[in-house]
């Protein structure tokens, strides 16, 4: 059940009662989207709560067609990077839809990517992310996700995992990793994954930036149509 449905308000009330009656503690809720917050406010459920926008957790929402075609002046640099990649590595790469049979190879690539990045990871963001990555990879057969990769000279050099919600025609990009030394590779898999795996998507949610400046700039450079706000809702003490 989506958080913004009427059922979510019932769940909220039960949780509040449980926190108060059984645990004698205030109820704090993280990562509440803007629509859910508004529904709860209109229902009068948040009179005794503060709401704090968590910028580091805002999701980035894009027009899928723009990311697939890279058309328009705003995407000119991105398109140039893709074209540069196509010219420089012509005949050496292929896009491939990946499946559970490719998991061990994907894990091997991911480990290599992690080892190369940890040296520059001052705030342990990579290790914080790693648990979620391996949970996804380890449950390949039980989760409804798509996975795609770029093979360079036969070996995986980039991979992406995402999912699709047909009711809102939105693709969600959960993981995207590529060899950073290969110029244009991130841009190419970004584009090709959507083209091959989510052709019907109207919107793309590339999730949050974890508060990392480089990731924030990269996501902003793709010109999101909006940011999906997230809130920390805290019961007043």
Located regions from the model:
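Acyltransferase donor/substrate-recognition loop-hinge adjacent to the catalytic core
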Residues: 45-121
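Short, glycine/charge-rich beta-strand/loop segments that flank catalytic centers
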Residues: 25-43, 56-58
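Single conserved hydrophobic/aromatic residue that forms the stacking wall/gate
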Residues: 1-8, 12
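Conserved GNAT acetyl-CoA-binding A-motif
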Residues: 22-33, 199-207
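Conserved active-site alpha-helix within GNAT-family acetyltransferase domains
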Residues: 36-52, 80, 210-227
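Aromatic (often tryptophan-rich) hydrophobic motifs at membrane interfaces
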Residues: 145-236
């Amino acid at each position: 059940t989506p958080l913004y449905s009427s059922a979510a308000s019932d769940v909220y009330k039960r949780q509040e009662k449980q926190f108060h009656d059984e645990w004698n503690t205030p109820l704090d809720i993280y990562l509440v989207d803007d629509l859910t917050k508004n529904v709860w406010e209109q229902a009068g459920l948040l009179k005794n709560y503060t709401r704090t926008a968590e910028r580091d957790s805002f999701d980035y929402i894009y027009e899928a067609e723009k990311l697939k075609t890279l058309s328009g002046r705003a995407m000119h640099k991105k398109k140039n990077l893709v074209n540069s990649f196509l010219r420089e590595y012509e005949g050496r790469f292929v896009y491939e839809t990946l499946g559970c049979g490719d998991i061990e190879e994907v894990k091997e690539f991911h480990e290599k990517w992690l080892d190369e990045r940890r040296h520059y990871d001052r705030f342990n963001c990579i290790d914080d992310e790693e648990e979620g990555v391996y949970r996804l990879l380890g449950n390949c057969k039980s989760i409804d996700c798509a996975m795609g990769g770029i093979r360079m000279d036969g070996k995986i050099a980039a991979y992406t995992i995402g999912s699709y919600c047909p009711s809102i025609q939105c693709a969600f990009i959960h993981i995207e990793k590529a060899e950073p030394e290969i110029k244009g590779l991130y841009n190419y898999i970004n584009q090709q994954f959507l083209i091959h795996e989510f052709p019907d998507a109207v919107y793309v949610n590339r999730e949050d930036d974890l508060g990392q400046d480089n990731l924030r700039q990269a996501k902003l450079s793709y010109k999101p149509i909006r940011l999906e706000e997230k809130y920390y809702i805290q019961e007043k003490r």
